[in-house]
A protein has these predicted regions:
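Key DNA-contacting residues within the recognition helix of helix-turn-helix
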Residues: 127-131
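Short amphipathic alpha helix immediately N-terminal
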Residues: 92-105
């Protein structure tokens, strides 16, 4: 596990959203018109080569894109799991709650003053607890 940084923690929500987007793409890519490709084959039915265009599903492109997106999704899931384990591994209850509320819970970013209200502290204490814990972690 790499060193936990504020940037990795902040990226958590975006990573979760990207995982959902990748799941949708992985399941629906085959329906897309972008998977239709064309190729040229030579028709020898008249005794000499005549180029003919063949239109169809581009299987190689589909497999390449699916593999790329699947690998990206696996990496993002691993990253999110590491962040969740890091936050759950924080021994102090207040600090753990601050990290969970500020970095993990919900779909939209939360302001430190909102976290402060939830844990009954002032905003500067929230910022200080986050910075202090990340320095020692």
């Amino acid at each position: 596990m790499d060193k936990m940084t504020r940037e990795r923690l902040i990226a958590y929500r975006s990573n979760k959203a990207e995982i959902l987007e990748l799941e949708y793409v992985l399941e629906n890519r085959w329906k897309s018109d972008t998977m239709i490709g064309n190729d040229v084959v030579f028709d020898y039915s008249k005794g000499y080569p005549m180029p003919q265009t063949v239109v169809g599903f581009d299987q190689k492109k589909y497999e390449r894109l699916q593999e790329r997106d699947l690998n990206r999704k696996k990496w993002l899931e691993k990253e999110c799991e590491e962040i969740e384990e890091f936050v759950e591994g924080i021994p102090d209850s207040i600090t753990r709650r601050i990290f969970r509320i500020y970095f993990i819970d919900g779909r939209k970013p939360v302001k430190q003053k909102d976290v402060a209200k939830k844990v009954h502290m002032d905003q500067s204490s929230i910022s200080r607890k986050i910075d202090d814990y990340l320095k020692t972690a």
